[in-house]
């Protein structure tokens, strides 16, 4: 089924009035009285206190008893509600449209629907604003978000726990308040998933599980939602929110059996939970409705949609409408009786104590059912009513309960008078089982006695009543309802490889359990092969890296040798050039010494130029040598870095291999231990099974032997007594008896006309 989710807008107060909180907790009367005593300004001060953010500037002003909301200077003047005795005030709210919608819903609820509902919405908004205040306090500095990636790790356990505690409480009161999305929500979800398995946050796990389950419910991620609901119920079985969320999912998936079971168990914890009541009514309609019964399908969807929207103004009309259609059009008295009981159940809830339409619809439905010969005992059978009254009923329903008792007494007296006035008509008041299809159990529904047919009805009173019609014209339970209430069947929750599976017992679903286990074993084998291939691949990569390192070392050595040879050759050439220059200088000096001819100025200039050129060449050579040395140093540094990186990679791969090997060894040891334990248990069970029949056989043999011995002893005793009677005279017998012990037990035996006393001779005979 698809649920149409309503979106509240600030510029349409009528729609905002319909979108109220979805989940109601039991608030005590003291909390409501305290909220009534508070001034509205004080409530708003506590709501938006100490919160600053520069993302959205939202100013709320009250001008001439009207509310003026200004979002980011758009000047959206909205007349929402008129108040008295309110002064002007301005607030800077760090939120998007959702907080304004929640605030407006709170004001509307406070004005129109009284303080109880406003208190619930107010609690949800207050907890949500407290969460945002803590978030701003921890992660916002000067209006800008701290971009540190490890910002969550800097917080203490109590700080994160307090944040999620307020967030979970806000969701349980009014989940529309935190229906925001974006990077913040993704961070919160990832953080909540990580700390949900951490024992340090055990104190806050309940609200964290509620928050995660509700988020996954909104995102339609049913497997994740059900997982957190199951784990939440495992550790916190008294939290009705987990039952409500699971019922919501199962109703959406059209799994009516599990949904009905969740509703029933949740209502045992909190019988006034409206969400569970609505879902249960929708499940009953949907389960009873066949494919050829479109009206019931429409009604089921109608109840479900109204449950989702929580349009409380339409609730009584929905139940009255369903009850009337079930009688007039569908002719299903059982369904009408069930709906009547739910109307009574809703009337007892504190939120509907003064609903005139609900009372009117219930009374008219009651009159119609009674006119169709449905007895008052059927309507008020306590065995079928699945309502568990609270320990302390609300104060404003006590008077109505007294009035109801008086009406019950008056109605019973009227029925007795009618029975006395009509003695000929026989009506049997049997308890109607809503789950049975037997026509004989519901004879009352077929007793439509007219004034002219009293004799026929009296003649048929001794036997089971026959059907008065067929199809929709018959009021019999077997003819009128092809639709059965699917009773709650137990379901089995099994944990297979850290995954929760839910199966219906006594059905074909249990066969899936073995198939799932086989598939998981296949997956484990595949994983083992996969990891083995990965290890081989890693080993090959390591060998390749080692070869690369060896080749690099060899190439470096060769390069160094070549460089050394080149340097030696350059030095030899330079030395040769220097020697040639010295020889030239010596020859020139010798010639100048022998001759006194003064060289012309041109030759001197040439010599000076040659010397300058030689000096420049030497400087250039020195610079080249320095540059080459620098390049060599850089290359050596780069090569060393590469070697370090490769060595680090090798170390990491080796560590990974070691860790995987250790994990494998641990897993193999655990598997071996588990297999040994299982084998030992199987052997013990077999031994016990084998020993039991052996023990039984031995006991039976011992009993048979004892019986045979007793028979033989009795026979021997009788024979010995007869022999003594034949052989010994009476005097000898009397003397023999006098000599025996008097304390021994005596027996009387009649032998013809004589009676003989004797004691047990078994010991002596043996």
From Swiss-Prot:
<protein>
    <recommendedName>
        <fullName>Putative uncharacterized protein DDB_G0287113</fullName>
    </recommendedName>
</protein>
<feature type="region of interest" description="Disordered">
    <location>
        <begin position="1"/>
        <end position="27"/>
    </location>
</feature>
<feature type="compositionally biased region" description="Acidic residues">
    <location>
        <begin position="665"/>
        <end position="707"/>
    </location>
</feature>
<feature type="compositionally biased region" description="Low complexity">
    <location>
        <begin position="441"/>
        <end position="478"/>
    </location>
</feature>
<feature type="compositionally biased region" description="Low complexity">
    <location>
        <begin position="418"/>
        <end position="430"/>
    </location>
</feature>
<feature type="region of interest" description="Disordered">
    <location>
        <begin position="658"/>
        <end position="727"/>
    </location>
</feature>
<feature type="compositionally biased region" description="Polar residues">
    <location>
        <begin position="431"/>
        <end position="440"/>
    </location>
</feature>
<dbReference type="InterPro" id="IPR011990">
    <property type="entry name" value="TPR-like_helical_dom_sf"/>
</dbReference>
<feature type="compositionally biased region" description="Basic residues">
    <location>
        <begin position="1"/>
        <end position="21"/>
    </location>
</feature>
<dbReference type="GO" id="GO:0005856">
    <property type="term" value="C:cytoskeleton"/>
</dbReference>
<feature type="region of interest" description="Disordered">
    <location>
        <begin position="413"/>
        <end position="478"/>
    </location>
</feature>
């Amino acid at each position: 089924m698809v649920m149409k989710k309503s979106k509240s807008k600030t510029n349409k107060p009528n729609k905002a009035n319909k979108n109220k909180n979805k989940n109601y907790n039991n608030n005590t009367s003291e909390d409501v009285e305290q909220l009534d005593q508070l001034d509205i300004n004080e409530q708003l001060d506590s709501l938006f206190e100490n919160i600053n953010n520069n993302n959205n500037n939202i100013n709320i002003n009250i001008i001439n008893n009207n509310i003026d909301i200004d979002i980011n200077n758009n000047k959206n003047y909205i007349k929402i509600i008129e108040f008295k005795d309110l002064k002007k005030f301005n607030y800077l709210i760090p939120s998007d449209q959702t907080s304004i919608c929640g605030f407006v819903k709170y004001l509307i609820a406070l004005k129109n629907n009284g303080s109880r509902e406003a208190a619930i919405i107010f609690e949800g908004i207050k907890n949500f604003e407290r969460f945002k205040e803590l978030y701003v306090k921890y992660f916002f500095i000067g209006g800008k978000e701290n971009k540190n990636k490890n910002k969550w790790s800097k917080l203490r356990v109590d700080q994160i726990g307090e944040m999620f505690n307020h967030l979970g409480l806000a969701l349980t009161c009014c989940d529309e308040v935190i229906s925001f999305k974006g990077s913040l929500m993704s961070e919160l979800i990832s953080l909540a998933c990580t700390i949900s398995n951490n024992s340090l946050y055990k104190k806050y796990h309940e609200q964290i599980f509620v928050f995660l389950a509700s988020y996954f419910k909104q995102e339609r991620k049913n497997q994740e939602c059900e997982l957190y609901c199951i784990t939440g119920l495992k550790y916190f079985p008294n939290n009705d929110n987990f039952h409500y969320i699971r019922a919501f999912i199962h109703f959406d998936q059209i799994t009516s059996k599990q949904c009905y079971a969740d509703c029933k168990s949740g209502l045992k914890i909190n019988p006034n939970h409206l969400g569970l009541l609505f879902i249960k009514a929708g499940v009953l309609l949907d389960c009873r409705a066949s494919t050829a019964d479109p009206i019931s399908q429409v009604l089921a969807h109608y109840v479900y949609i109204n449950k989702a929207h929580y349009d409380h103004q339409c609730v009584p009309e929905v139940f009255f409408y369903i009850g009337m259609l079930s009688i007039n059009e569908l002719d299903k008295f059982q369904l009408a009786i069930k709906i009547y009981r739910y109307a009574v159940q809703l009337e007892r809830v504190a939120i509907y104590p003064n609903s005139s339409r609900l009372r009117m619809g219930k009374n008219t439905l009651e009159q119609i059912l009674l006119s169709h010969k449905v007895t008052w005992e059927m309507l008020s059978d306590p065995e079928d009513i699945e309502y568990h009254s609270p320990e302390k009923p609300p104060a404003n329903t006590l008077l109505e309960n007294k009035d109801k008792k008086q009406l019950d007494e008056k109605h019973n007296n009227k029925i007795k008078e009618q029975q006395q006035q009509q003695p000929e008509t026989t009506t049997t008041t049997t308890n109607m089982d809503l789950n049975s299809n037997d026509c004989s159990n519901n004879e009352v529904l077929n007793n439509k006695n007219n004034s002219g047919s009293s004799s026929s009805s009296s003649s048929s009173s001794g036997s089971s009543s026959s059907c008065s019609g067929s199809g929709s014209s018959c009021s019999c339970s077997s003819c009128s309802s092809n639709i059965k209430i699917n009773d709650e069947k137990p379901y089995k929750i099994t944990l297979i490889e850290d995954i929760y599976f839910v199966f219906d017992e006594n059905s074909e679903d249990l066969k899936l359990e073995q198939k799932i286990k086989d598939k998981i074993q296949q997956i484990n084998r595949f994983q083992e092969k996969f990891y083995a291939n990965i290890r081989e691949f890693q080993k090959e990569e390591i060998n390749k890296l080692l070869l690369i390192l060896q080749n690099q070392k060899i190439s470096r050595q060769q390069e160094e040798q070549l460089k050394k040879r080149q340097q030696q050759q350059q030095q030899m050439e330079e030395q040769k050039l220097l020697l040639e220059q010295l020889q030239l200088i010596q020859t020139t000096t010798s010639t100048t010494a022998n001759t006194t001819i003064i060289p012309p100025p041109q030759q001197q200039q040439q010599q000076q130029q040659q010397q300058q050129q030689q000096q420049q060449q030497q400087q250039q050579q020195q610079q080249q040598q320095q540059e080459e040395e620098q390049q060599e140093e850089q290359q050596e540094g780069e090569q060393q870095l590469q070697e370090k990186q490769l060595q680090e990679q090798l170390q990491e791969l080796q560590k990974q291999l070691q860790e995987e090997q250790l994990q494998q060894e641990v897993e193999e040891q655990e598997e071996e231990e588990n297999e040994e334990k299982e084998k030992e248990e199987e052997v013990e069970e077999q031994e016990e099974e084998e020993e039991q029949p052996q023990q039984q056989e031995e006991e039976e043999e011992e009993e048979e032997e004892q019986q045979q011995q007793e028979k033989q002893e009795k026979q021997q005793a009788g024979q010995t007594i007869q022999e003594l009677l034949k052989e010994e005279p009476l005097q000898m017998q009397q003397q023999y008896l006098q000599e025996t012990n008097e304390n021994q037990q005596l027996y009387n035996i009649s032998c013809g006309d004589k009676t003989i006393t004797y004691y047990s001779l078994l010991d002596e005979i043996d």
